């Protein structure tokens, strides 16, 4: 009887956990609204109640080189200039702190990374996790819904289409009217820093 009740309790916990998981549109090709269509294509859409953004660029690099760079999470602060701090809590869970332009507070988040492959594409997705507790720093706004991923699609042996997708929600005191500009800036910055790191 106790065993049966415990099984029901665990099953309920699993259902609740999955019901609150954020759905990331990693394989969604429709309903994206263009924000910028230069060498770096930046788009967004509201999906599962959140403003998801993505930036796509053709990178002169192999998939293997990009994967090695993206998996080096502990050194993200050396790759992405807006990241002030990146600390591995486990092999796949990382705590990241972001610098924000004055007068806004910094942002931080704890996310867990997951690898997957769909046909020839490599997907490195991430989602906020509470598996490891990290104290909140009053100087930072915790992005509790942080999520997104990297999609790597091979063009040829030396060229890769790289897509970076992220939940554009910034919370805190960041004004809604400035979000679109922030998304465009973030998409351009991230792709530029990736290319710089590969040189």
Which sequence ranges carry the predicted segments?
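Eukaryotic helix-grip
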Residues: 22-199
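Positively charged n-region of N-terminal signal peptides that target proteins for export
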Residues: 1-9
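N-terminal leader/targeting segments
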Residues: 1-2, 16-17, 56
């Amino acid at each position: 009887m106790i065993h049966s009740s415990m099984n029901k309790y665990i099953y309920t916990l699993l259902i609740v956990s999955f019901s609150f998981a954020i759905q990331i549109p990693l394989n969604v090709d429709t309903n994206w609204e263009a924000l910028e269509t230069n060498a770096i294509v930046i788009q967004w859409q509201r999906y599962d109640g959140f403003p998801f953004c993505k930036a796509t660029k053709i990178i002169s690099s192999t998939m293997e080189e990009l994967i090695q760079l993206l998996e080096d999470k502990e050194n993200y602060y050396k790759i992405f200039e807006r990241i002030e701090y990146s600390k591995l809590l486990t092999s796949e869970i990382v705590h990241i702190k972001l610098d924000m332009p004055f007068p806004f507070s910094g942002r931080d988040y704890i996310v867990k990374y997951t690898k997957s492959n769909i046909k020839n594409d490599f997907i490195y997705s991430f989602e906020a996790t509470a598996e490891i507790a990290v104290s909140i720093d009053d100087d930072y706004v915790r992005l509790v819904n942080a999520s997104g991923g990297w999609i790597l699609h091979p063009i040829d042996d030396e060229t890769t289409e790289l897509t970076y997708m992220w939940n554009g929600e910034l919370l805190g005191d960041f004004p809604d009217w400035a979000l679109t500009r922030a998304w465009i800036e973030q998409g351009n910055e991230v792709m530029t820093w990736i290319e710089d790191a590969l040189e």
